[in-house]
Regions:
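N-terminal accessory regions of nucleic-acid-interacting proteins
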Residues: 1-26
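Intrinsically disordered, low-complexity regulatory regions enriched in Ser/Pro/Gly/Thr
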Residues: 13-17, 38-42, 95-98
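Short acidic, Gly/Ser-rich segments with clustered Asp/Glu that frequently serve as metal-coordination loops
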Residues: 26-36
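Structured beta-strand/turn binding interfaces of compact recognition modules in eukaryotic regulators
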Residues: 27, 49-51, 106
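Common nucleic-acid-contacting/processivity interface regions adjacent to the catalytic cores
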Residues: 32, 197-198, 202-268
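Short conserved beta-strand segments at catalytic cores or DNA/RNA-binding microdomains
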Residues: 42-55
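Conserved DEDDh/DEDDy metal-dependent 3′-5′ exonuclease domain
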Residues: 58-198, 209-213, 217, 224
Length: 268
């Protein structure tokens, strides 16, 4: 991985014209140890797609990567995970990677702790500039600046989003979002859900497909929302919540109708 794999750095204060959407998911095996439930991380899944402000997109490419070992210390860092996903994506797509990246999961509070950066909950949140919004983690205050590459010389900006907050009120589950996309979440038995390690050992291909599908739904739903949001507001971004779309539309209406947003009355 080198600078030549990425788009040129964007001039300061210039508009973003393309994003890399990196949907991700983690699979765990829960076990009871000394009356405490511990979660062993089994795998990370990712799905990458580039979206541009002209409405064009790349293909959606996906994959799976395992931690280095069974212990917490063996988990990947956020940097390592992003590098693995981007490297594999670029091998398949042969395009320059945008430096503005949306990292998207469904219920980030479950998936973000899978990175070694988050071993210490408080320090991890501070390091990744995360805010707790409706009991999940997103980046509100500022982007997460990450330096990729062997020499840490490739600057990218990460924005963390949670599709749970971007889902319709009566369609909050990942399965619901998959149905909206026409991309069904794969079915799994209760026994396998409670013993993901057993499923992983017994049927690796299905285990991989099950996890990767979840990350693909996150990516494709995010792309769909960015396009919809741009069509409605002419702003090229993925909002924090579905509610913020309505707020922006109201402000847009006020602007177009010369109304004062402070009191809803005509401007004089």
């Amino acid at each position: 991985m080198s600078e030549k794999d990425f788009a040129d750095p964007r001039p300061k204060n210039s508009k973003v014209s393309e994003y890399l959407i990196l949907g991700f998911d983690t699979e765990y095996q829960s076990k009871l140890l000394n009356d405490t439930i511990n979660n062993d991380l089994l795998s990370y899944q990712w799905s990458c797609q580039v979206i541009r402000s002209d409405g064009t997109t790349s293909a959606n490419r996906s994959g799976i990567v395992l931690p280095k070992g069974p212990d917490v210390k063996d988990r990947l860092s956020l940097k390592e995970f992003i590098e693995i996903a981007i490297t594999d994506f670029r091998k398949k797509e042969k395009i320059k990677i945008p430096r503005d990246i949306y990292l998207v999961a469904h219920f980030t509070r479950s998936d973000i702790p899978g990175f070694i950066d988050f071993k210490d909950d408080k320090l991890g949140r501070d390091k990744l500039n995360l805010s707790n919004v409706r009991n999940s983690f997103v980046s509100v205050r500022k982007d997460v600046d990450v330096q990729l590459g062997k020499d840490n010389d490739i600057d990218v900006s990460i924005k963390l989003r949670d599709t749970l907050h971007l889902a319709p009120e009566k369609a909050k589950s990942l399965r619901d979002l998959g149905e909206i996309l026409g991309k069904s979440k794969l079915d799994i038995s209760i026994n396998d859900l409670e013993n993901m390690k057993g499923l992983m050992d017994r049927d690796w291909e299905f285990f991989k497909e099950y996890g990767v599908r979840d990350s693909e739904i996150c990516t494709e739903y995010s792309v769909k929302l960015i396009l919809l949001y741009f069509d409605l507001t002419r702003r090229f971004l993925l909002p924090l919540t579905l509610t913020s779309i309505g707020v922006d539309l109201l402000v847009k209406h006020w602007d177009e109708s010369s109304m004062d947003p402070k009191n809803g009355l005509p401007r004089i």
